Amino acid sequence: MRLLTLSGLFFMLFLCLCVLSSEGRKRPAKFPKLRPCCHLSPRSKPITWKGNHTRPCRPCRKLESNSWVVPGALPQI
């Protein structure tokens, strides 16, 4: 009887340790293909000799505005 109780408690402790130890781990992120960023403009699109547009760089992210808005506030007129 005691052996069954102790083995059950040991199993529950082992199960909790396994779950909690793997909870905070993240999978390793895949590294994207690193290309320099460039600003899109009509002149920045190079054309191959066949006439196809190429994009050797990725578009740069737009900078977010630093304006701060109070959530739920009504606009002032």
Curated annotation (Swiss-Prot):
Annotated Pfam families: GPR15L
Intrachain disulfide bonds: 37-60, 38-57
GO MF terms, alphabetically ordered: chemokine activity; G protein-coupled receptor binding; receptor ligand activity
GO cellular component: extracellular region; extracellular space
InterPro entries: GPR15L
Chief localisation class: secreted
Source superkingdom: Eukaryota
Subunit and interaction comment: Interacts with SUSD2; the interaction is direct.
Protein's name according to its UniProt entry: Protein GPR15LG
